[in-house]
Amino acid sequence: MFGRLLLLGILFHVVFLKSIFDIYFVTPLIHGMKQYSAGEAPAKRLFLIVGDGLRPDKLLQPHSEKVIGEEQTYAAPFLRSIIQNNGTFGVSHTRVPTESRPGHVALIAGFYEDVSAVTKGWKKNPVNFDSVFNQSRHTYSFGSEDILPMFSEGASDPSRVDTFMYSSELEDFSSNGIVLDEWVFDRLDELLAQSLEDKELWDMLHRDKIVFFLHLLGIDTIGHNKHPDSVEYVENIQYIDGKIQELVDKMNNYYNNDGASSWVFTADHGMSDFGSHGDGNLDNTRTPIIAWGAGIQSPTHEKNYGHDEYSLPWNLTEIKRIDIQQADIAALMSYLVGLNFPVNSVGQIPLDYLDCSSRRKAEVALMNALEIGEQYNLKSASKDQTSIFFRPYSPLRNYTEVQASFYNSVIADIESGEYEIAIEHCFHFSQTVLSGLRYLQRYDWLLLRSIVFFGYLSWIGYVICFVFSLNIEPSSKIVKPVSVVKRVAFNIPFLLICIFFYIQSSPPFYYGYALFPTIFLQLIHSIFPNTKLGFKNFLTVAKQKHGFSLLKILFISLCILCLLQFIVYSYFHREGFSVILMGLAAWPWLLHADYAFSHKTISVSWSVLTSLLCFFTILPVNKKESLLFIFAGGFAMSVAGVFYILYRRNQAFQYSSTVTNKQLVLQVLIIMATVPVTLKIADSLQRNIAIPPILRLVAFGLFITSYIIPSHHIRSCKHYFLDRLAILFLTFSPTMCMLSISFEALFYVVLFITLGLWMELETELQKYTEQLHPEYSRKKDAKFHLSLSHIRISLFFYIFINVAFFGTGNVASLSTFALDSVKRFIPVFNPVTQGALLMYTILVPFIALSAAFGIMNKRLGGIQQVTFFLAVGMADIVTINFFYLVKDEGSWKDIGVSISHFCISNFLILFITALEHASAILCKNITYTIHEKVN
């Protein structure tokens, strides 16, 4: 019975996970659009130079002598001279996620890649949309193998894009990132030298519509390792600045100063002060944009124009700062070398960057607007063919007529010399089209969101009904078959919706969204008589044990709903969990005062530990590596281990357990050895000192040994439950110490002890209650009685699941993880292995939770499956909130976080299932009784 419900629940959540992508993030990609070109090109060739992970403030601000030396004030004097004398500059604003793939897609393809594209892979990421490289005559790209294949393999003609890539082994976080950039510049030099002997290559390099792409990863590598405020980060900027100056001189000589080269220098994303990126932190979303050469406007001297507090320290306020959106750069590059705009581009060409007449700017703006409008035209026509009673976007109701009117109006303005008016019309038309595209993406929202909401509601209703249906005598169970008429009545709405979806050629998943509510309603109907009987029994027990009436039960239910809503708030403001933990600290004193005052030791200990947990959820989520915190965590682990060994020496349960003090001492010694090794490696990395291979070997040895020792002794053993918890705590302690960068190890210690205390408190509280109400004692009555304590345990379990995650960070900090810990083991860039280590660190507290929860449920009489489904039901109440809180506009940090919140909450059933199975494994061969030593 439980197995079928679990399987149905997992299938439901897997299917409904896709709902947010079908509703909120319909791919913007369409094909078959007419292409538009900006016309005559001011340049024959374009140099796109991307400083991966470069922040504009670190590039342009003055630096102290300590950082940059006595001879210089600025890290990039050449690029500053370009800004002051030759080109145009500003800040390019990126979108979340601030990672290399979406950043480069926006730069080179002109649109912000849709979320569904994350399934296309991590390494090569082949893209299936148009790009500047695809429109070029030929592109020569140099850099990382994680970026370049995206555009070569996605090109309509792959031979059009040449890639020169170094291997991932060169991306060593413990070495100097300049090596990566040096490799790029050297390969370009080799290409130029080769052209002197290769006529075909020479001829190609001297043709028009040529693009050179230099991906410089050194700054990103150094930023992750040393952080942006380090000397090494600034040194890498200095190196790039010098090499760009050399490259400009080389290219001028190579092309005989023909003045046909355009240069664009920018970044795919920035970097936080903690050496991470990924979220919407302004340090991550702001990147530099400096353009110069053919077709680029010389600097405009207009004091304070575009400047704010962010750019005042750069001492460039006399130069006009022109900010753009990252996708606008693709349109700019297309204009510079006379390419067709990428057909999926939504970027609007930044006219202030162009060195041309007002008439030419108006003509370029017109072509840009028509290119964006073509996307709406094709998408609207496609929607019209598959929708019943299609309602087009009102301002574009008849697109052909609207476009013709717009085109004629702009041409008339241009011919009459009203260029500014023409440009304004183009901008307004583009904005209208973008609004129309958004309208089409939201076209089916109301219907789909209603179906999904009803799906979750019916699932929660079925879970509640199922739990109450268990609260009856087996002999009282009512088996009532559902009549054919009722089955047909239940399925009629589903059939009507299916017909509607079929006519509209809807995706297969749409049918699944409609199917599940139908199934759940039929299941609810079939068990409802037993549910009513079980609920009556529940009310009877609640009244006899606690004196609670139906009204009080409803009030408690309302309080639980309010608490779940507060958990939703706490996902966005994690300090909310501190408030919840303070409530848990006061719980025994407020609701079980008689027990708390008669068992002060355990009650006070509980309040102290849950209060300590409060501090972790108010500490900063973005952490810098702290040797002091790492030492404190390791010291606390060692003290806890020693304390337990001393404690068990005087306890009778040591004779019931096969665990020896020798084994526990050995595990504690491993922790003690781990602490200095971790501190030495971390200190060496901070000071940029080479780590001896023997030290890394010792670290790996300690890491592996910490698992070998307990696994060697755990087989065929009978452990007393406290011994099993101690072994698990000591087993994972070295891992948490080695992979901690701040207070993670301390959090692990406090959480583990708190969970152990929760287990003991619930067990003792049940014994106390059974003494007061012996008629419900498990010894006298083997029947299952659903009570308020089961609901409380489920609620606490769900709270601790969230605390285990939010205790050391939040969703945004997870997406911007710092590599300080994993590079102690793996200095070479390897996203899969490094990501696995980081995820393992996050999962360790949940392993502790599963062990404590499993042991507690065994001691309470095997209630795990009931508490499991109650926790799932609570989680899905939160999931409904997150479903409606998913954002597809506004702050791009909020968009990414809202998606993550829904996915995490929706998949809690899988996670809780994994915890349940983990607890079954972790709780094998455990004894719960004490046998005295026989003399």
Curated annotation (Swiss-Prot):
Glycosylation sites per record: N86, N134, N315, N398, N925
Keyword Cell wall biogenesis/degradation: yes
Bilayer-crossing regions: 6-26, 450-470, 484-503, 510-530, 548-568, 577-597, 601-621, 627-647, 664-684, 689-709, 738-758, 793-813, 836-856, 866-886, 895-915
Enzyme class at the top of the EC tree: transferase
GO cellular component, one term: endoplasmic reticulum membrane
GO BP: cell wall organization; GPI anchor biosynthetic process
Assigned keywords, A-Z: Cell wall biogenesis/degradation, Endoplasmic reticulum, Glycoprotein, GPI-anchor biosynthesis, Membrane, Transferase, Transmembrane, Transmembrane helix
Residue ranges that the UniProt entry lists as topological domain Cytoplasmic: 1-5, 471-483, 531-547, 598-600, 648-663, 710-737, 814-835, 887-894
One Gene Ontology term of the molecular function aspect: mannose-ethanolamine phosphotransferase activity
Record bears the keyword Lipoprotein: no
UniProt-annotated location(s): Endoplasmic reticulum membrane
Bilayer topology term: Multi-pass membrane protein
Similarity comment: Belongs to the PIGG/PIGN/PIGO family. PIGN subfamily.
Protein name: GPI ethanolamine phosphate transferase 1
Organism: Schizosaccharomyces pombe (strain 972 / ATCC 24843)
Highest classification ranks of the organism: Eukaryota, Fungi, Dikarya, Ascomycota, Taphrinomycotina
